[in-house]
């Protein structure tokens, strides 16, 4: 068994020249941070994780973690796979380590506040300690100021920060003020300040000379794990359990007085804990590493790097530049960004231009027709501004690329509408754009104008009937159709070639209200995919298909491919960037956000004011520009693309992975994009399901979506065929998901149905489930087991998309961990594994309206009516384990007369049992082998592979074991330690027809590892 890739907690991170070095389990990863290229992955320790790194100016790396320490050359780390031979084991836990001033020795700080001075072979030369102190340390660093000046900064578990001189072994200060353990301490390079963070969520700044507390910084909402000084000791950067990275200014008001002031907050990791942080001072770039395995680069000069990121003007400022005077209550009522700058309109019809080159405002013209509720739109790529009012007047202005000239203007009135309350525009084809007008009168038509891009003349006019409760909010075009978003999560599709054709209406697309954006995504054959967002946080991907009819041209149909909900407040729109990542934007309270939904991190944020805000977001060459009015000032905020890659690793879940499932390969799948690997799902304690893809050869994982439908930690997820997946969790949540992977750019996944719950406020957990498909049908039988010992059997009907309960009962009063259907001969058996250590078998053949095909084992539907029946008594019970049976797998023999059952338990045991039907179909269940100490802790997963001849097990002791089965007996053939903590889930891709073929193992827990066997 060999490692292919690993994603898990990254505990430390350091910049070194053009590299970023990160501690990933027992490995160190080296990246070129300018290109986000992983240069090498080198193993430093046998078992322990790398907790900290120190780098010498000569290219040596000092790494430590738990009791392990090693010194290696950077050149070797860049080229070699393993350097574990250099690992040395210390007698005590190491909390900090660094090189001496001349780089000829190292200092190791242990958890007992002792320092070991070692040579470069890690041999101890001297031991230093502080007399009279018996503190246990949670953290600590050693700060080297010179050959004879070395300070030890010890963060104790009892809330004190002890600073002592290494060579004189004398105490300098015991800084008291924190409540709870000290998680990190740091000293400024100039020797003036000490900064500490702790369990109490505060950062405290101390004067090193006097020991006086200078300032307390409150901002983090959870424990703070790490901090450091940067920018000539004028700033602090801190990272926390709250997944934010925060920057603090140290404001010196007078001598020996300094204040901590929060400067920036970056939401950069998932769910729980950022562990490491470092700053490259000369470029002002930070890197963070977290529990989710992400390595995130942060541009600390996001608001200053280009010099024109933030601009604002009052109406007086604009008036001075224009040489014009605005009326007392006049205000800006609309604005649009173009290649040259901004075009804006005031409440009295004054049209203004702001040049992004000269930074000057100019009054272009005044049109008093547009002093009545003006609406501003534009075709940004063509520099065409569109103004409308509530009296159905339209003004079009086309500018030259440099805005020096107005090329064309056109003004017209629409007689078809008595009043207008909304105007929308969208690009159409190479020669024209579309403009739609809506009247508040429900009896009046919805008007769509096709307008020439060259002379701004109306080329054609379309008047459509409006559906009931129609209120247009967004618009896009596709071929000869327009798609109009409306309130009540409604989408209306009009055919521009036939005004008399009834519109195609999609109602209640999501539970939210106003549709905020519609974007074309991709198409294939006769189908096209659109992204639809909703202000209440929902986004949906729909597939529109043209179905040819014998009579008439075609008929439209739609299907929801993907649905999800943002957790960021109001959602105003979304788009895909050049990397294929889904970017969303909107408002959370008064904060505007730009968010990478694919990889789950914030790109930018801006405080924008209240709910009735006037704003606009536009694309520019190297980013976006946000325009908004706040406190009567017009603000321009340019959000540039980062000068460095956003991430070096995207990571996985923020908390442990409970289950993994690989999608079986479909014989009908014609998409070649996923042929080098597999689509798979991970279900996590963080309540989310991630849909991703891994490459078979490299093990590289790409995430596509993070589903948030569950409200509690996941228990199980399982693909039941190549297009359906089931997930379960607490609160009796069980969802049936449908996968669509026919499109070229990404797969999609949406909920098809939810299992009915027993009560409105259930707290039961669905521990496991299994399905049995009905032959030549999409229908299946589903068995679910619950934490209160309940067993339920359901019939899913595909054509009705409905779960019907057909059987229920209880085992005893203990929790049920696992369940499987086993079809032997013509009998359908249900096997459960409860917490009492037994295997329990039920024969339900006579109680379900199906029979079993003895050859294939599939169910045969006899179209019989089913009533809810009680679960029959067990036909066999076998005590296999002393306590809970945590894993269950089986393989039936070729004749389907018996099955081999594998169990792993809380008692560290591994059991092999034989389930058999005799000639009279009586069930016998016997243990064929049991290994009492198959692991040193709970066996969490076990899988039979190679037709039941081999076994792979995972256990909490972080050891993966491979076993062989010979004549019904288990024998250990291989074992290897994994760096995934809380090892719980296992999934294997293998070819049972070829025993010698390579097998791919996915191992989940706190992290994800991909192995080959």
Curated annotation (Swiss-Prot):
Organism: Saccharomyces cerevisiae (strain ATCC 204508 / S288c) (Baker's yeast)
Record has Signal as a keyword: no
GO terms, biological process: endocytic recycling; tRNA methylation; tRNA nucleoside ribose methylation; wobble position ribose methylation
Family: Belongs to the WD repeat WDR6 family.
Phylogenetic placement of the source organism: Eukaryota, Fungi, Dikarya, Ascomycota, Saccharomycotina
Compartment(s): Cytoplasm; Endosome
Alphabetic keyword roster: Cytoplasm, Endosome, Repeat, tRNA processing, WD repeat
Described function: Together with methyltransferase TRM7, methylates the 2'-O-ribose of nucleotides at position 34 of the anticodon loop of substrate tRNAs. Required for the correct positioning of the substrate tRNA for methylation. Also plays a role in the regulation of the retromer complex and is required for the recycling of plasma membrane proteins like CAN1 and MUP1 from endosomes. Involved in regulation of Ty1 transposition.
Free-text disruption phenotype from the record: Increases Ty1 mobility 31-fold. Slow cell population growth. Simultaneous knockout of TRM732 leads to activation of the general control amino acid (GAAC) response and severely decreases cell population growth.
Record's subunit section: Interacts with TRM7; the interaction is direct, and required for 2'-O-methylation of position 34 in substrate tRNAs. Interacts with RRT2.
Region (Interacts with TRM7): 48-223, 658-938
Keyword tRNA processing set for record: yes
Listed name of the protein: tRNA (34-2'-O)-methyltransferase regulator RTT10
Gene name linked to the record: RTT10
SUPFAM superfamilies: WD40 repeat-like (SSF50978)
A cellular component annotation (GO) from this entry: endosome
WD repeat start-end pairs: 5-41, 45-84, 132-174, 177-216, 219-258, 269-308, 465-504, 586-625, 652-702, 709-747, 761-804, 811-852, 880-928, 934-973, 975-1013
Miscellaneous comment: Present with 3450 molecules/cell in log phase SD medium.
Gene Ontology molecular-function annotations: enzyme regulator activity; tRNA binding
Pfam family, one: WD40
């Amino acid at each position: 068994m060999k490692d292919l890739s690993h994603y898990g907690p990254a505990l430390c991170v350091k910049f070194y020249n053009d590299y970023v070095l990160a501690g990933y389990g027992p490995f160190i990863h080296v990246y070129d941070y300018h290109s986000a290229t992983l240069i090498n992955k080198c193993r430093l320790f046998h078992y322990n994780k790398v907790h900290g790194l120190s780098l010498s100016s000569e290219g040596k790396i000092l790494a430590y973690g738990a009791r392990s320490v090693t010194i290696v050359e950077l050149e070797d780390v860049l080229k070699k796979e393993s350097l574990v031979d250099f690992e040395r084991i210390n007698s005590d836990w190491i909390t900090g380590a660094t090189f001496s001033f001349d780089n000829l020795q190292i200092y190791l700080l242990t958890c007992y506040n002792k320092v070991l001075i070692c040579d470069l072979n890690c041999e101890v030369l001297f031991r230093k300690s502080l007399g009279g102190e018996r503190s246990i340390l949670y953290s600590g660093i050693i700060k080297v100021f010179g050959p004879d000046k070395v300070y030890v900064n010890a963060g104790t578990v009892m809330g004190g920060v002890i600073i002592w001189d290494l060579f004189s072994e004398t105490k300098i200060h015991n800084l008291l003020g924190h409540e709870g353990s000290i998680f990190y301490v740091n000293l400024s390079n100039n020797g003036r300040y000490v900064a500490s963070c702790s369990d109490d969520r505060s950062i405290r700044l101390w004067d090193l000379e006097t020991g006086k507390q200078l300032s307390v910084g409150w901002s983090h909402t959870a424990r703070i794990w790490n901090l450091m000084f940067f920018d000539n000791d004028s700033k602090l950067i801190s990272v926390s359990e709250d997944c934010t990275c925060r920057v603090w200014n140290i404001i010196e008001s007078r001598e020996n007085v300094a204040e901590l002031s929060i400067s920036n907050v970056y939401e950069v990791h998932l769910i729980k804990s950022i562990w490491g942080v470092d700053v490259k001072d000369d470029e002002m770039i930070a890197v963070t590493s977290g529990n989710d395995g992400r390595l995130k680069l942060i541009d600390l000069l996001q608001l200053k790097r280009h010099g024109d990121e933030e601009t604002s003007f009052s109406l007086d400022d604009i008036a001075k530049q224009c040489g014009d005077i605005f009326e007392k209550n006049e205000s800006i009522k609309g604005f649009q960004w173009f290649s040259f700058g901004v075009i804006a309109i005031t409440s009295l019809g004054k049209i203004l231009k702001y040049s992004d080159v000269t930074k000057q405002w100019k009054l272009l013209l005044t049109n008093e027709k547009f002093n009545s509720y003006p609406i501003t739109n534009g075709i940004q790529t063509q520099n065409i501004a569109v103004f409308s009012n509530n009296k159905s007047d339209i003004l079009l202005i086309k500018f030259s690329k440099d805005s020096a000239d107005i090329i064309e203007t056109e003004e017209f009135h629409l007689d078809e509408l008595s009043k207008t309350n909304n105007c929308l525009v969208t690009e159409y084809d190479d020669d024209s754009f579309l403009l739609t007008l809506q009247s508040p009168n429900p009896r009046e038509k919805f008007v769509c104008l096709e307008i020439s891009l060259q002379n701004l003349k109306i080329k054609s006019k379309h008047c459509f009937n409006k559906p009931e409760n129609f209120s247009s909010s967004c618009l896009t075009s596709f071929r000869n159709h327009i798609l109009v978003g409306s309130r009540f999560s409604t989408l209306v599709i009009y055919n521009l070639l036939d005004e008399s054709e009834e519109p195609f209406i999609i109602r209640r697309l999501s539970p939210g209200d106003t549709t905020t954006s519609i974007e074309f995504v991709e198409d294939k054959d006769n189908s096209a995919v659109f992204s639809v967002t909703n202000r209440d946080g929902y986004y949906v991907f729909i597939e529109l298909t043209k179905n040819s009819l014998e009579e008439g041209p075609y008929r439209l149909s739609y299907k929801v491919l993907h649905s999800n909900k943002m957790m960021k407040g109001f959602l105003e729109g979304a788009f895909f960037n050049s990397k294929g990542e889904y970017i969303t934007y909107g408002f959370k309270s008064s904060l505007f956000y730009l968010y990478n939904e694919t990889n789950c991190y914030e790109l930018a944020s801006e405080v924008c004011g209240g709910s009735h805000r006037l704003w606009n977001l536009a694309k520019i060459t190297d980013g976006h520009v946000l325009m908004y009015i706040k406190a009567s000032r017009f603000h321009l905020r340019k959000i540039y693309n980062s000068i460095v890659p956003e991430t070096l690793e995207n990571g996985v879940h923020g908390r442990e992975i409970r289950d993994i499932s690989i999608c079986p390969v479909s014989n009908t799948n014609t998409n070649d994009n996923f042929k080098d690997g597999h689509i798979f799902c991970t279900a996590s304690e963080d309540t989310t399901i991630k849909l991703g893809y891994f490459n078979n050869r490299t093990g590289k994982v790409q995430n596509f979506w993070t589903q948030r439908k569950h409200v509690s930690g996941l228990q199980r997820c399982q693909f039941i065929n190549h297009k359906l997946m089931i997930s379960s969790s607490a609160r009796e949540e069980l969802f049936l998901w449908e996968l669509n992977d026919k499109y070229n750019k990404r797969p999609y996944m949406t909920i098809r149905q939810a299992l009915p719950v027993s009560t409105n406020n259930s707290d039961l957990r669905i521990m496991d489930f299994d399905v049995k498909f009905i032959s030549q049908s999409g229908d299946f039988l589903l068995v679910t087991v619950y934490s209160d010992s309940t067993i339920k059997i359901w019939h899913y009907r595909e054509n009705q998309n409905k779960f019907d309960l057909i059987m229920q009962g209880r085992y005893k009063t203990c929790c049920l961990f696992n369940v499987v259907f086993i079809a032997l001969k013509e009998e359908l058996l249900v096997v459960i594994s409860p917490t009492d250590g037994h295997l329990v078998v039920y024969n339900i053949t006579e109680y379900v309206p199906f029979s079993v095909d003895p050859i294939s084992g599939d169910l045969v539907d006899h179209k019989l009516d089913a009533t809810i029946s009680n679960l029959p008594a067990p036909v066999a019970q076998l005590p296999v384990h002393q306590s809970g049976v945590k894993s269950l797998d089986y393989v039936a023999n070729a004749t389907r007369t018996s099955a081999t059952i594998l169990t792993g338990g809380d008692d560290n045991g591994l059991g092999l049992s034989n389930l058999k039907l005799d000639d009279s179909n009586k069930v016998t269940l016997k243990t064929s082998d049991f290994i009492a100490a198959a692991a040193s802790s709970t066996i969490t997963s076990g899988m039979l592979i190679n037709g039941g001849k081999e076994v792979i097990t995972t256990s909490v002791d972080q050891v993966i074991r491979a076993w062989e089965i010979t004549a019904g007996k288990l024998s250990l053939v291989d074992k290897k330690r994994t760096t995934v903590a809380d090892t719980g889930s296992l999934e294997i891709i293998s070819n049972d027809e070829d025993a010698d073929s390579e097998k791919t193992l996915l191992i989940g827990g706190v992290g994800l590892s991909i192995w080959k066997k």
